[in-house]
Amino acid sequence: MRHALFLMILFLSLSCTSRSQARRDSINTLSDTLSTPDSIMSADTLRLLFVGDLMQHQGQINAARTATGTYDYSACFEYVKEEIGSVDLAIANLEVTLGGKPYKGYPAFSAPDEFLTAIHDTGFNVLVTANNHSLDRGRSGLERTILLIDSLNIPHAGTYTNAEEREKKYPLLLEKNGFRIALLNYTYGTNGIAVTPPNIVNYIDTAIIAKDIEVSKTLHPDAIIACMHWGIEYQSLPDKEQKFLAGWLLQKGVDHVIGSHPHVVQPIEVRTDSLTNDKHLVVYSLGNYISNMSARRTDGGLMVKMELVKDSTVRLNNCEYSLVWTAR
């Protein structure tokens, strides 16, 4: 049975307001403040897109297997490929290892190599890899995943073979259209599996994150974006820790926060700095992007687009989201 992603709503120009009734009154919106003046047309523009969890459960692996024993995922992304290709940077959470055979789904994921090839061919050009499944195949799985991502020249953040590699490549600096973006990535844990030295998984530790933010600032980025694997699974609202960390990250100098892990969509906020009037996007959870999960609200998620413009300053000019649904 094939698994394919469908766009439910394209280009929802709602300025990233959440439609969650329980949160509607507490969401700051950009509908009045992010109109696009003519002067912006001459400014440099960077379009980013974020999606949630790229997963491979056993049903998906079985469905992708061909008669020749290879795996074909092209049909999974055919309806979203155009949307992915419309942006400058498309960033996704790779929530599987590429640990080699035997290929397995939950609870210890190891996806076929062809899954990564399909992700790359769809247009995703940045991956974050720090999540609770990073160590599902131990040291060999972590290192093989990094090796394969590097073989396709896909920039990535979150897991590293050793401290030297982390120091060299982290924070991940993305340069596009004259912009410099520092990308950070952390996870709450790895399902109780301890990382094997010298490998490194970026865990959520405020002391370490604070240092990483300061290193990011030395790179003179136009924006610092933190991708956080956090929260409680299947909960439609962020918990206290998510709310605290989001505020703390912004206070420390992060410009935008993008969350994953709950497997369901959680609210989006746009916060305004009272001193600078800068706009900061907080997405508590993008939900799933592609999976075989059957629990309520886990069969889809968000694709969130944000547009940065730069003239005399860098600012969030617009944001919007599309809904995706996995047909199976």
Model segments located where?
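Positively charged n-region of N-terminal signal peptides that target proteins for export
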Residues: 1-4
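Acidic, metal/ion-coordinating pockets
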Residues: 19-328
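C-terminal motif of bacterial Sec signal peptides marking the signal peptidase cleavage site
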Residues: 14-15
